[in-house]
């Protein structure tokens, strides 16, 4: 009786206790195993009840369907399969079952035949099917001719990468749910994820992470018709459809591998609300894939997506919270090892490796195994014929021309089938259209529509230009992306006519669009564009004409030059034009005359050199840019020392080559007679590089007038710069902002300034780590120099003592300085006393900036005393952020009444408030006030002072510029100002109203003022909530020819789509009006006073 009660107690209550110990995910797993192990005699299990059951309900269901001891027997088996050994042991001890009833083996996830059958839902058959399908993973053709042990080394490296793809991020602590494996075409992405499928099926990868892994290939998916997601993932299941409910029941244990995203021919433009989450409903496959990628379908599931670098930007727009991993391919050591194993003659190997490594772009391409093999094969043929591999490796186009030609070269007496010109043109058109549309997989029907017959395709397959996919029917691809890009470039060389306005011209034939493309916006076009320029080389053309026995036209040269001229005359800034990419293309031509012609319309270039290849192409092209006047340049990484890891002798390394390229680049300073400005910034130059630069600066033919060396580290201080200042009589402007020259560096500069041969007029030393100790040297230089008129010492810790020394020079009659900036130099009221005396005695100083110093009201009083002195000739005074209050308004008002020279005053970011401004306005509207530019930005003003400001606008005929930004004027205040702006005697040309709390309510007043005022040409309205209604009101005026506004400060992206359309329409109707967010009056071309600092 006791036994009976005991056995009934545990099924009724004891089992519930154990179920309570399972977390939510473990409970779901328990239910799935329960579904799999239900005994047949019980008939259909009420799965819907089990799936929804809480723990107590589940215990009751098990009692019902497994009476007596059977419930515990099933439960213990499930606990064992879930590897919950502790629960198994505790349960067995409590119910004291004998070993015969429940043996130890029953509590483990055993491998008996019974358990294999019971756990059919674990995907055993599916795993077997995957093993059959993916057993041949590593494509031995990808590295033809290499030893097996080399192949094994690459496999081991990439296997480790696979194992850690879904590891927890050590920085964020998050486990990635979406991993994007990106890399160049052919680098091995597909091979790697197929290997992942095989390893998972064999039980050696992701076993604790994913219960099911599914492989979805882009090429196959493109050919599928409408279906459900369940049908899509069941394609590899042994039966018609897998145990889909079980699979979907725990989506967090699913991994979907989406291979070759770049080959999916889907636009992915479906709105999110239209996407599907029901895996049983049929949809177009494009909808299913979009739903999966955008986490609408099975949001808990994990994704591993492979894509080429050229389409990663397109993929990024679809994904949320993804983790990028780049597959780099063969390392430098691996490439070297491969080359040395490919060539039996080690001298040949050394020559090939050295030649490839000298071209960083080409050597980078060889990270792809197939490209490395092709390069070695091609260069080996060249060397066997006695050719110069150095020339072949000079450009990527030269090497690929050689390789493509080798595919049609007779071997062993055989004669390859050459395509006729029509066939070749059709192939090139297919390639070009594919590159433009990012189509890399072609189906038989597509090729037929594009003009390639099956006979044509077979011919190109025989020549290893095109290959048929062995697994997916009717799929064709070029043997490598670079092969497609090369034939795409050839399309433009075979095109017969380049007449303008040809109505039959297709988008991919637009050369102007191709030239304007950038690697950031259109990375898929970059290499094709390089190949196109490379094919302009006459030697390349002759080689291809011999190979294909056809005629290629160089008429495209003149067409490209026309497009370059249009770009050169456009409004694009140098940074927008992407000169580095252009130089890559021009370098491919190796045609000096063409480069000179192409660059004749570009007076200014901006390039950022951060790789050796950048230095190579820039130095080559800049020598032939004869019309250059300005070079803006940044050089990083290139000159950093590195430990060499190569078996080559050290004299073959590219250190000498880097020096030679830098020498070539710097030689432009004396070979280009038009060059006037060099802006070298944020650059790391070693001692040798700096010596080369200074040597060129001292060259007698160097005509440079303006030299900017901002944020530069000088290995040997400023001695070389100082010497250049003496030798180069053309140099008038030197900017060393952010360069850590220190007091010692300034000492050297001051010695040069005192030299009679030094003609420097402008010296900018902002943020140069200067202290009071350099001020005596500067003071002496100011007295001795007869040319220096502009000195900027901002953001240096000079303090009042340093300024005292400078003021001694300012009071000297031989000091010729006209403009001085001491912004953020640690000055106080004490420093103003010295400056005040200097202003009275100095007859030449016209511009003084004291911004960002704690002068206080006492300091302003001292400056005001100087201003009202009759001998003070100051024209511009900047007191921005000087920590004074409305009390200073009284001092300034008095001095401004007497001062006749001051025309520009900046009082921004001080606590003036309405009362202070009202005091100033009494002076500003006085007929004798000569003020032209007034800066009151951020002065804690409200609409209460706007009547006074309006009075100034009306009564001061000299006032041209007024900035009231960052004040709480609101709509009522602007309405008052607009009333004044409408008067015909208003002379305001620039008005700043940024961040003034404006809404759409003031836009009608602004519109009215813009119509009436014929002098207002610049207005800033950024950081206001004008909204769509406000833009509608402004739109009517802005598009009118009566509106004379030239620059309007507005951020288009801050408005909704409809408002943005209106602003775009304004640009069409009124092309003279520029709308931009950075409506900055302080531009170099503007003669506004503030730019002088």
Curated annotation (Swiss-Prot):
Function: May be involved in inflammation and spermatogenesis.
Region Disordered, residue ranges: 102-121
Protein's recorded name: NACHT, LRR and PYD domains-containing protein 14
Transmembrane segments: none
Description of its domains: Upon heterologous expression, a small proportion of the isolated Pyrin domain forms homodimers and higher oligomers.
Residues binding ATP, per UniProt: 183-190
InterPro entries (UniProt xref): DAPIN, DEATH-like_dom_sf, Leu-rich_rpt, LRR_dom_sf, NACHT_NTPase, NLRP_HD2, NLRP_innate_immun_reg, NOD1/2_WH
A molecular function GO annotation: ATP binding
Source domain of life: Eukaryota
Gene name for this UniProt entry: NLRP14
Domain Pyrin: residue ranges: 1-97
Keywords: ATP-binding, Cytoplasm, Developmental protein, Differentiation, Leucine-rich repeat, Nucleotide-binding, Repeat, Spermatogenesis
Tissues where the protein occurs: Testis-specific.
């Amino acid at each position: 009786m006791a036994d009976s009660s005991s056995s009934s107690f545990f099924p009724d209550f004891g089992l519930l206790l154990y179920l309570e110990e399972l977390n939510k995910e473990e409970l779901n797993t328990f239910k799935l195993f329960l579904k799999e192990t239900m005994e047949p005699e019980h008939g259909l299990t009420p799965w819907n009840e089990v799936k929804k059951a809480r723990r107590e309900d589940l215990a009751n269901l098990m009692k019902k369907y497994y009476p007596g001891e059977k419930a515990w027997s099933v439960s213990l088996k499930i606990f064992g399969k879930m590897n919950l050994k502790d629960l198994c042991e505790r349960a067995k001890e409590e119910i004291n079952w004998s070993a015969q009833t429940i043996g130890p083996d029953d509590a483990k996830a055993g491998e008996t035949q019974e358990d294999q059958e019971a756990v059919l839902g674990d995907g055993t058959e599916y795993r077997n099917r995957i093993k059959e399908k993916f057993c041949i993973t590593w494509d031995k053709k990808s590295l033809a001719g290499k030893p097996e042990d080399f192949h094994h080394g690459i496999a081991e490296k990439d296997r480790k990468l696979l194992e850690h793809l879904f590891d927890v991020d050590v920085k964020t602590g998050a486990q990635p749910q979406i991993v994007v494996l990106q890399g160049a075409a052919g680098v091995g992405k597909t091979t790697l994820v197929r290997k992942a499928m095989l390893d998972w099926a064999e039980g050696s990868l992701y076993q604790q992470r994913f219960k099911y892994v599914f492989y979805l290939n882009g090429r196959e998916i493109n050919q599928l018709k409408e279906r459900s997601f369940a049908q899509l993932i069941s394609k590899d299941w042994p039966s018609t459809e897998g145990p889909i409910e079980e699979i979907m029941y725990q989506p967090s244990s699913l991994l979907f591998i989406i291979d070759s995203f770049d080959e999916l021919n889907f636009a992915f433009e479906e709105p999110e609300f239209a996407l599907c989450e029901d895996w049983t409903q049929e949809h177009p496959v494009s909808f299913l894939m979009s739903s999966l990628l955008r986490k609408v379908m099975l949001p808990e599931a994990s994704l591993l997506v492979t894509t080429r670098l050229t389409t990663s930007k397109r993929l990024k727009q679809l994904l949320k919270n993804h983790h990028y991993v780049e597959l780099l391919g063969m390392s430098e050591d691996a490439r070297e090892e491969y080359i040395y194993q490919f060539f039996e003659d080690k001298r040949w190997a050394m020559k090939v490796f050295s030649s490839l490594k000298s071209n960083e772009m080409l050597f980078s391409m060889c990270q792809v195994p197939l490209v490395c093999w092709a390069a070695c094969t091609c260069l080996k043929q060249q060397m066997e014929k006695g050719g110069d591999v150095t020339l072949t490796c000079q450009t990527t186009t030269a090497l690929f021309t050689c390789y493509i030609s080798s595919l049609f070269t007779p071997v062993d007496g055989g004669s390859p089938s050459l395509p006729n010109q029509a066939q070749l043109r059709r192939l090139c058109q297919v390639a070009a259209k594919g590159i433009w549309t990012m189509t890399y997989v072609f189906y038989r029907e597509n090729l037929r529509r594009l003009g390639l017959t099956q006979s044509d395709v077979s011919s190109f397959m025989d020549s290893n230009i095109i290959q048929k996919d062995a697994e997916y029917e009717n799929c064709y691809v070029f043997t490598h992306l670079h092969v497609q890009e090369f034939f795409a470039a050839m399309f433009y060389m075979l095109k017969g006519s380049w007449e303008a306005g040809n109505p039959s011209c297709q988008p991919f034939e637009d050369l102007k669009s191709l030239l304007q493309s950038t690697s950031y916006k259109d990375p898929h076009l970059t290499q094709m564009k390089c190949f196109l320029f490379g094919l302009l080389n006459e030697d390349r053309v002759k080689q291809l004409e011999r190979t294909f026995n056809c005629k290629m036209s160089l008429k495209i040269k003149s067409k490209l030059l026309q497009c370059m001229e249009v770009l050169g005359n456009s409004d694009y800034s140098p940074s927008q034009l992407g000169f580095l990419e252009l130089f890559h293309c021009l370098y491919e031509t190796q045609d000096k005359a063409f480069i000179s012609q192409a660059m004749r319309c570009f007076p200014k270039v901006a390039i950022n050199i951060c790789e050796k290849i950048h230095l190579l192409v820039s130095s080559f092209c800049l020598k032939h840019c004869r019309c250059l006047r300005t070079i803006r340049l940044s050089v990083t990484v290139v000159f950093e020392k590195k430990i060499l890891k190569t078996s080559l002798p050290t004299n073959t390394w590219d250190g000498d080559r880097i020096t030679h390229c830098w020498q070539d680049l710097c030689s432009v300073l004396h070979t280009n007679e038009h060059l006037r400005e060099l802006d070298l910034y944020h650059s790391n130059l070693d001692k040798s590089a700096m010596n080369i630069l200074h040597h060129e600066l001292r060259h007698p033919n160097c005509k440079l007038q303006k030299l900017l060396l901002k944020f530069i580290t000088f290995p040997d201080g400023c001695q070389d710069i100082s010497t250049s200042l003496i030798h180069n009589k053309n140099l008038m402007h030197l900017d060393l902002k952010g360069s850590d020259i220190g007091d010692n560096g300034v000492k050297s500069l001051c010695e040069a300034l005192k030299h009679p041969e030094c003609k420097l007029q402008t010296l900018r030393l902002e943020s140069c780590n200067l202290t009071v100790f350099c001020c005596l040297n500067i003071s002496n230089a100011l007295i001795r120099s007869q040319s220096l008129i502009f000195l900027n010492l901002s953001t240096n810790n000079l303090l009042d003592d340093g300024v005292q020394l400078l003021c001694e020079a300012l009071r000297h009659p031989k000091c010729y300085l006209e403009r001085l900036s001491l912004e953020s130099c640690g000055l106080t009221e004490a420093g103003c006393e010295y400056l005040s005396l200097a202003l009275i005695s100095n007859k030449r100083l016209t511009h003084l900036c004291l911004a960002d110093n704690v002068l206080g009201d006492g300091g302003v009083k001292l400056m005001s005393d100087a201003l009202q002195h009759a001998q003070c000739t100051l024209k511009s005074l900047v007191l921005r952020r000087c920590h004074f209050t409305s009390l200073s308004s009284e001092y300034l008002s008095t001095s401004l009444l007497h001062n006749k020279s001051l025309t520009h005053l900046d009082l921004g970011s001080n606590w003036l408030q309405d009362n202070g401004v009202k005091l100033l306005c009494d002076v500003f509207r006085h007929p004798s006030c000569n003020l032209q530019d007034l800066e009151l930005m951020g002065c804690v003003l409200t609409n209460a002072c706007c009547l006074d400001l309006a009075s100034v606008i009306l009564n001061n005929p000299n006032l041209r510029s007024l900035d009231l930004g960052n004040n709480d004027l609101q709509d009522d205040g602007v309405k008052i100002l607009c009333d004044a702006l409408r008067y015909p005697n208003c002379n305001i040309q620039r008005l700043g109203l940024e961040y003034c709390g404006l809404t759409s309510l003031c836009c009608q007043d602004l519109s009215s003022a813009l119509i009436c005022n014929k002098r207002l040409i610049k207005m800033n309205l950024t950081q206001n909530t004008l909204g769509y209604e406000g833009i509608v009101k402004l739109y009517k005026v802005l598009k009118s020819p009566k509106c004379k506004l030239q620059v309007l400060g507005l951020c288009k992206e801050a408005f909704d789509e409809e408002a943005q359309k209106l602003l775009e329409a304004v640009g069409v109707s009124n092309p003279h009006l520029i709308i931009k967010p950075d409506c900055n009056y302080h531009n170099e071309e503007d003669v506004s006073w503030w730019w002088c600092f």
